Structures are given as C-alpha cells and as structure tokens.
C-alpha cells in the first residue's frame, strides 16, 4: 500500500465495493426492515467502527497487553466494560467476543468439559444453534438435553423443565431463545439450576435492549453468566459481550483470550462502548417502549378474524417482546412464499420454522417479524398500525402487491434513514 492509496477514499480505490455499499444504503432506506435480529446502528457507532482503532493490535486485557502502544485502546475497552456492568448491574463484563456465537462458545468452554451435559431450548422450538444444535460445536462437544415448548400453548412450562433437569442432571442450563415471543422466568430457571447443581447461563441476545430500558426482567441477578449480542435490540455493532459473577471472571476471560480468540477488534469494542452509553439514555428507553408497542400492535392485527379465516395465526397468541411469530401451517402460503411476497411489497422479514414444523428449514411454515429497526427509524403507534395492516393484507389471497408497496413507500419517505448522509 502506498501513501497515496492510504489517503484515497473508497470510491476511488474500489468503486465496485463502494457501489455495493451505496446500493445497500439505498435498500435500507427504501424498505421496511423487520428482521427481528436486525437494527440500525447510530451514526456514532458506525463512526467508531470506521476509526483508526481498526489498525491496533491489543492481545490481552487492559493493563496486561502483549503489545505496546495500547494506552488509548485500554481507555476504550475500560469504558465499554464499565458501561456494560453499569447498564445491566453485572460484576464483570468481557467485551472482546467477536460475536454472540463466540461469546456463547467461550461460556461453554469456561463452564464445561467435553461430554458434560448442556440443557437448552430446542432449535426447532425457538432456541439458538449454539444452544445444542447437533452440527454446531455445542452439539458436537457436549451432551445435549433439549427442552421444548408445550404443544397447547407454545410456551415453556417450568414444571416440565424442572422434571427434565432432575432426570438429565445438566452441568449447565441455558435460558434464552432466537424465536420465542414471551418473557422467561429467570428466578425459576435459577432455582432449578441450584436444585440440580448446574450453572445458569442466560443468552439475552434478542432482548438485551429491552432489559437495558427496564422493560423486561433482568437476568443478570439470577444467572451465573449472561451473554448477548450488541446489534439486535441494543442497536450497536455486530459483536458479543459476556457478563458474569465476580468469581467467574478469571475463567470467562481466559476462555475468550487466549482460549478462543487472539487480538480483539478494538474498533468494534469502541462501537460497543458508544452503544452502551446510548442504551443508558431516556431516548433509548422510549425507543424500546415503541418497539414493544409496535410488536403488540402487529400481533393484534395478525390475530384478527379476517386472517384467521385464511389460516394465519400467531404463536402464543401475542408477544411480550420485540417480535411476533406467525404460524402459516393452515395457510395457503408457506414461510418462503410469505417472505418473498412481503419482500416484493418492500418489507424484509425472515421465514422461520414453527414448533413441529412439517416443512423443511429452507421453506418453513412461519415468519419471524420484528419491530426494533422501525422503532429506531422513528415509527410510533400510528405507523405500526399501518405496517401491521400492510402485512395482514399481504398474507391474504389476492393481495395487490403494487398497492401495498405504495403504502410502504409513503412510510419510508416519511421517516428517512440516515438523513444528510449522501455517500457512505
């Protein structure tokens, strides 16, 4: 790399990548993002991630690095750790995991030996692949005892979880999900873990932003270890964080570095520090209130009689969180068809398996629809009511996709994304 290239903008050095980024910005601006695991990072977070911290190697932890010149990245990492602890009331935070999956894998390595038993929610019933999926490292290294939702309610029955834990005697119980629309009983999970001599690990990747806003029970006081991503409801960089009790600090830190990772991504850690600061603000809490309100408006519309007539329903009958799980098993549409139809209308969602789904994973019989990105964009009850009706109309036979797209266009124009940003 020459000095001249070092100082040239992306559009000059690589116009192909620059154009793809610009096109993606256009896509995000012109559509309604309703994938439950996605959000719009504040510009301050994007700037932190695009900073010169990208250049710095910093193996180790603040005050104990294996490279020189780390005095300023130490400041950044300490800010991120302290803010995470304060935000969630944790004894210790490790902000180095590159992703939520890395955080989860590190926790398992810290708390278990290969062959130990992990008990988590089945992937087919809303769990995450790192909670014991057979082809994931969690399913390869550990013995898995998966619990499921109840067939009548699609909810987790804690009495059943206790019965299974008493039989399986797991070393670790993980409470968390990727597709579940109700709050978990963390106190009950801890009681069960204590009864069977297990550690309780909570994966709050999806609902951490709701916890930070005080709108969802905080798992940290109940869990031995808590993990999260930072980019979902927290709207930070794509990355992970681990929170733990003080006596597990050394085990957790060692499992992350040198156990699984080398140099931390200091630009991402800077983005985490910024995101945690924003998450402590009243503006953030207000956004989370609109996030939940929007999901509940959506759930109410999708349980209306006109949709029920066409075989569309909502798992658990509603939601306590930021997402709605749509059941299409009795509909003319499968999950992929519904996802594609909504895409044509300008709404991005993801097809999702429902419990006991008869269709293959690439097709599915459901949709997972989330509201965080639209709340970040500024949507309130009025706009969520309109979006909910657009989705409802799209899922009924004979939908006029062009007319629905016009309604979506009106919303995106009313709430511009990253205004003033002409070129990225």
UniProtKB/Swiss-Prot annotation:
Cofactor or coenzyme needed: pyridoxal 5'-phosphate
Keywords: Amino-acid biosynthesis, Cytoplasm, One-carbon metabolism, Pyridoxal phosphate, Transferase
N6-(pyridoxal phosphate)lysine PTM sites in chain numbering: 232
Residues bound to (6S)-5,6,7,8-tetrahydrofolate: 123, 127-129, 245
Cellular location(s): Cytoplasm
Record-marked site positions (Plays an important role in substrate specificity): 231
SUPFAM superfamilies: PLP-dependent transferases (SSF53383)
Pfam families (UniProt xref): SHMT
Catalytic activity: (6R)-5,10-methylene-5,6,7,8-tetrahydrofolate + glycine + H2O = (6S)-5,6,7,8-tetrahydrofolate + L-serine
One MF term in the entry's GO annotations: pyridoxal phosphate binding
One GO biological process term: tetrahydrofolate interconversion
EC number, UniProt record: 2.1.2.1
Main enzyme class: transferase
Pathway(s) this gene product operates in, as recorded in its UniProt entry: One-carbon metabolism; tetrahydrofolate interconversion; Amino-acid biosynthesis; glycine biosynthesis; glycine from L-serine: step 1/1
Cellular component annotations (GO), alphabetically ordered: cytosol
Assembly, per entry: Homodimer.
Role of this protein: Catalyzes the reversible interconversion of serine and glycine with tetrahydrofolate (THF) serving as the one-carbon carrier. This reaction serves as the major source of one-carbon groups required for the biosynthesis of purines, thymidylate, methionine, and other important biomolecules. Also exhibits THF-independent aldolase activity toward beta-hydroxyamino acids, producing glycine and aldehydes, via a retro-aldol mechanism.
Family to which the UniProt record says this protein belongs: Belongs to the SHMT family.
Protein name: Serine hydroxymethyltransferase
Annotated source species: Kocuria rhizophila (strain ATCC 9341 / DSM 348 / NBRC 103217 / DC2201)
Gene this protein is translated from: glyA
């Amino acid at each position: 790399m020459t000095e001249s290239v070092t100082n040239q903008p992306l559009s000059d050095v690589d116009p192909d990548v620059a154009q793809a980024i610009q096109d993606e910005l256009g896509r995000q601006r012109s559509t309604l993002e309703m994938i439950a695991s996605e959000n719009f990072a504040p510009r301050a977070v994007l700037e932190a991630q695009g900073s010169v911290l990208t250049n710095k190697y910093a193996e180790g932890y603040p005050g104990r690095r294996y490279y020189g010149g780390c005095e300023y990245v130490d400041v950044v990492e300490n800010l991120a750790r302290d803010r995470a602890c304060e935000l969630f009331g944790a004894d210790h935070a490790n902000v180095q995991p590159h992703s939520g999956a890395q955080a989860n894998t590190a926790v398992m390595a810290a708390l278990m030996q290969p062959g130990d038993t992990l008990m988590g929610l089945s992937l087919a019933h809303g769990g995450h692949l790192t909670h014991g999926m057979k082809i994931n490292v969690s399913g390869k290294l550990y013995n898995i005892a998966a619990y499921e939702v109840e067939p009548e309610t699609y909810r987790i029955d804690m009495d059943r979880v206790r019965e299974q834990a008493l039989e399986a005697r797991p070393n670790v119980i993980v409470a968390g999900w990727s597709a579940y629309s109700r709050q978990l009983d963390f106190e009950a999970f801890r009681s069960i873990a204590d009864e069977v001599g297990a550690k309780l690990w909570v994966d709050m990747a999806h609902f951490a932003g709701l916890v930070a806003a005080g709108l969802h029970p905080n798992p940290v006081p109940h869990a031995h270890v808590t993990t999260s991503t930072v980019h979902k409801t927290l709207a930070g960089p794509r990355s992970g964080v681990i929170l733990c009790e003080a006596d597990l600090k050394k085990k957790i830190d060692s499992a992350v570095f040198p156990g699984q990772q080398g140099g931390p991504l200091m630009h991402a850690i800077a983005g985490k520090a910024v995101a945690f600061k924003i998450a402590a603000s009243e503006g953030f809490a207000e956004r989370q209130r609109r996030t939940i309100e929007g999901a509940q408006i959506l759930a109410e519309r999708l349980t209306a009689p006109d949709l029920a007539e066409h075989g569309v329903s909502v798992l658990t009958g509603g939601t306590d969180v930021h997402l709605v799980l749509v059941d299409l098993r009795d509909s003319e549409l499968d999950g992929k068809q519904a996802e594609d139809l909504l895409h044509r209308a300008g709404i991005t969602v993801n097809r999702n398996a429902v419990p006991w789904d008869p269709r293959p994973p690439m097709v599915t019989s459901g949709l997972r629809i989330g509201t965080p990105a639209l709340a970040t964009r500024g949507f309130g009850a009025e706009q969520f009511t309109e979006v909910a009706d657009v989705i409802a109309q799209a899922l009924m036979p004979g939908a006029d996709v062009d007319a629905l797209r016009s309604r979506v266009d009106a919303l995106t124009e009313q709430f511009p994304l990253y205004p003033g940003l002409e070129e990225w």
